[in-house]
A protein has these predicted regions:
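Hydrophobic alpha-helical transmembrane segments
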Residues: 58-72
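Alpha-helical transmembrane segments of integral membrane proteins
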Residues: 39, 43-46, 70-73
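Juxtamembrane "helix exit" motif at the C-terminal ends of alpha-helical transmembrane segments
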Residues: 42-58
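Conserved non-transmembrane functional hotspots
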Residues: 1-41, 52, 62, 76-161
Length: 161
């Protein structure tokens, strides 16, 4: 493999990783909302239902609704706390920024000067450092980003991220 081919592979890899981390951040932000919004709505409904049940203590469906809302709210809150979707989203955003900086540095060098061995080593070390701190992608996400890079007109598949 020639140095030019290696740098070309690095450009593709950095581009894929950069985009995949942003896509992962969006994915985890959506999950955070999917769990968070229903929890807030259920909390409001539960609060309203408590006041209603005080007035209609003998109505069975009100008591059943309170139990269902309480259990659902506890389950969603627990899942949201356990999976830490907002934290995961933030970690992917940070990784995307770090990898983007490495990518932009490489692209700038390719435009304005030759890439020598010392520069290539420095880029590889920066990329390795960013990868060590980066979280893993959701299953199949990187492959979808790679497919989109090869076929830009293809729509992304709906599953996962």
């Amino acid at each position: 493999m020639t140095p030019e081919e290696l740098i070309g592979q690095w450009q593709q890899g950095l581009g894929n990783s950069h985009r995949a981390h942003y896509e992962a951040a969006k994915y985890y932000e959506r999950l955070h909302l999917w769990f968070g919004v229903p929890t807030v709505v259920m909390s409001a409904l539960l609060g309203t239902t408590v006041f209603t049940s005080l007035q209609h203590a003998d109505v069975a469906w009100v008591k059943t609704l309170m139990v269902v809302l309480s259990v659902s709210m506890i389950a969603l809150t627990s899942l949201q706390t356990f999976f830490k979707y907002s934290e995961r989203a933030e970690r992917h955003k940070t990784a995307a920024v770090q990898i983007g900086e490495v990518r932009h540095e490489l692209e700038q060098k390719l435009q304005f000067g030759p890439v020598d061995e010392a520069f290539a080593k420095a880029i590889r070390e920066k990329w390795d450092a960013a990868d060590r701190q980066a979280p893993t992608f959701p299953p199949g996400l990187y492959e979808r980003v790679e497919t989109l890079r090869r076929n830009p007109l293809q729509k992304p598949s709906g599953g996962g991220a």
